[in-house]
Amino acid sequence: FGDGQRDTDTFETILEGIVLVQYGISRPGETTLSIVHAFGHGLTRTDDVQQGAAHAVVAPDVLEYLFEQAGVDARVGLLANALGVGDAADQAAAVVSAVTEVRDALELPTRLRDLDGPEPDDFTAVAEAVLADSFMANVPPGLDPTVADIEGVLEAAW
């Protein structure tokens, strides 16, 4: 976006995006930060991992996990429309693909093994930290992840 231009229109659009994102996560008396952010906390709790990098790596796998859970409204249609893939036959796969494309276009890390962070032997402790994170209170209704579920997401992201 902006093709590298540093003009007023580009900066106004960027600022608008920042404000909309912040409104989306922070409201008076509540937050909408949820499972992806909890993963970020779990992955950065003891290691020298930048939280944004952790989010970039796990977001596609967390979304895939959410979309696979029966009876959980992960708002796939809303996400698909927001990402411009609302007409896709498989909206869940299209959302995961779109998020992956954004991450890759930003040249962010794609695998946990590429970060200076936890190793697979640490995944149980990371999963326990994710589940204990306060933002897990904001997961979609009906989602009740286990340590094994979280470890599975971490293994997929490895």
Residue ranges and their predicted role:
Residues 1-91:
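Active-site segments that bind and position negatively charged phosphate/pyrophosphate groups
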Residues 82-158:
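C-terminal charged capping/lid subdomain of soluble metabolic enzymes
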